[in-house]
């Protein structure tokens, strides 16, 4: 598995994307309800969303996620978290003490790592943990189908920190997160 953090500028053909998303829609879910909604932004819409998200981060707005974001990893999970961050920043030749470079690298999350498309997964909030499990299954299926077609992807939890611009752009009701 690879989380791609640098993408080609060329968009994926619409019919290819539609076929992949259609196939992914058949992912299993609890009681076969397929509770996810997938919102895809490309072109000018994606750029507008990127700009709004970066503006939120640059203005140091406080994250306002729809779901619990305040997870403090402990034990082996914390070790893996630090190991992952160390591997990432080492690959980018950014030292631990280079805070500004780390912040700039982190900012690329909200620029979607320059991917030509961004897919955002939402679900009704009341579905809680079962909905999260279903979205995880869907996300894995989508990732594998994309890879099968030679298309890289990167699952980004960071985007959930600032749902406001996404909610506004796609006119999401309050009960969806």
Residue ranges: model-predicted function:
Residues 1-177:
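Acidic, surface-exposed loops and disordered segments
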């Amino acid at each position: 598995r690879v989380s791609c953090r640098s993408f080609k500028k060329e968009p994926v053909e619409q019919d290819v994307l539609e076929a992949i998303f259609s196939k992914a829609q058949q992912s299993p879910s609890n009681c076969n309800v397929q509770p996810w909604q997938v919102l895809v932004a490309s072109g000018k819409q994606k750029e507008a969303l990127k700009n709004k998200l970066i503006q939120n981060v640059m203005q140091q707005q406080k994250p306002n996620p729809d779901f619990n974001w305040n997870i403090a990893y402990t034990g082996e999970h914390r070790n893996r978290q630090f190991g992952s961050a160390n591997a990432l920043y080492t690959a980018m030749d950014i030292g631990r003490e280079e805070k500004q470079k780390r912040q700039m690298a982190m900012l690329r999350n909200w620029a979607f790592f320059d991917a030509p498309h961004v897919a955002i997964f939402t679900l009704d909030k009341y579905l809680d943990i079962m909905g999260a499990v279903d979205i995880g299954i869907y996300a894995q299926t989508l990732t594998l189908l994309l890879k099968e077609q030679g298309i890289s992807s990167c699952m980004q939890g960071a985007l959930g920190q600032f749902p406001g611009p996404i909610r506004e752009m796609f006119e999401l009701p309050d009960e969806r997160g």
